[in-house]
């Protein structure tokens, strides 16, 4: 009993610690710049160490609880409670999110030190984290929706932080609009649950849906996850989101916004267990996403955009795990992915800052001599991303591909996922080769220095996580689904073989700059990849242009010509003109015409009287 009390109280204390810096901003006295260091970073750091207590209790005793704090709303047939669900998923995810955010906040202290609104920036980052915590620990759909909308609005504010830049404003609007599409799916699903199941409590939903056809609400949930986690069709906002400051990109892509959609499906996965249509949809959608975005990453030259596309590719892999009916593997990949993706963004931010805001990898090179720590950590995170054995990404990526390999599902999903895994190795090695190796390809700069503890310490902490976190999580989390225990050697080594194939391909491509096989290379495939499959041009340019053209035609032709000219006053005028012309022609003073008309009228009248 006392263990359960300690378990619940420490988790609620963690929320209190995180909200304390927000409450201090209610003071009308403006805080100084040390507020970010004294309050925000310290609060997240303290909350992380506090969250380790329930984590160790869970690992030791397996305790999972649901804490109901108060009743939000009560009607005759419908209750909404504010309750927190502390189970395997939330207890493991919370320390990881806090650890990653702690590193990002410390890095942001150095990265944003010249920003005049630095305190507000840190407050937004903290609110971003809190809303994600609310989403992760929610025990009902109403509370989950609060966290869902919270991460959405905070992402809009943070992506468009530098609102003086047109690209940042456009990226923020894209994020909101695409997420609105997903929000429609979640809202309609919640309405369906309220009408048909009469509850938003997750445990009651799982029980009452046992003999119910859940296809319609699950399609809404899939749409919601596709919007929030940037699946194919709703993906363009995620690469554009890198227009925000680098700490925002690191937090957004690692442990908050983009994994919210996948986490929604993990949390509500008991509803999907026996629905083959939804599972197949998730599998094919994830496979298509991971291949398409990995192919787009191959030809990008902006270092942050390459990393952003890699995030979208990994989200597709998580969706594949959902479609395989293995939600614990998707969750494992969320946890391991957070470490090396945050480190990749922090390393890229350090490099960009050192090179006077240069983001083109073609203008870098030779940084392993000038930034040895950053270069080493970039290499570690890139290898973890490719699934190098015994790094963090290996334990989750390899498990997903093994599960896909041994399942009796379509070969198309397996083929596309393996191709995407190979592409991951190609663009990761491309970053390493063009940024770290060879000679510098940039102009002479002031001496480059990375001897700042606020730069090195966060990156080193995340590097440790990228090395050992995968094994620690893999060994301590019990699977919720039965896993394949034996398989042939060729299936077991398929993932690492396609990764090696990708590395060899990338090494071969680096030599083709001097020994090209074709004088005029095929630019169609390159342009298709570089321009994201022409998707933004079609969706963001062609469709609005067509709508504007049709609107203009309707306004000028349909409204003006039809209503004003054909039906309105000009229409009446047009009807009267022929009659007027006929009368006018008969009244022109022509004697012969008058006599002829008189004669014809007289003859006609006489004939009629005689009859």
Curated annotation (Swiss-Prot):
It is a multi-pass membrane protein. It is an enzyme of class 7 (translocase). GO terms for cellular component: mitochondrial inner membrane. InterPro entries: NADH_DH_su5_C (IPR010934), NADHpl_OxRdtase_5_subgr (IPR018393), ND/Mrp_TM (IPR001750), NU5C-like (IPR003945), Proton_antipo_N (IPR001516). GO terms for molecular function: NADH dehydrogenase (ubiquinone) activity. One of its GO terms (biological process) is electron transport coupled proton transport. Its main location: mitochondrion. It is found in: Mitochondrion inner membrane. It catalyses: a ubiquinone + NADH + 5 H(+)(in) = a ubiquinol + NAD(+) + 4 H(+)(out). The chain crosses the membrane at residues 3-23, 38-58, 91-111, 121-141, 142-162, 175-195, 205-225, 246-266, 277-297, 306-326, 329-349, 375-395, 417-437, 462-482, 493-513, 591-611. Its EC number is 7.1.1.2. Belongs to the complex I subunit 5 family. Core subunit of the mitochondrial membrane respiratory chain NADH dehydrogenase (Complex I) that is believed to belong to the minimal assembly required for catalysis. Complex I functions in the transfer of electrons from NADH to the respiratory chain. The immediate electron acceptor for the enzyme is believed to be ubiquinone. This is NADH-ubiquinone oxidoreductase chain 5. It comes from Latimeria chalumnae (Coelacanth). The lineage of its organism: Eukaryota, Metazoa, Chordata, Craniata, Vertebrata. The gene is MT-ND5.
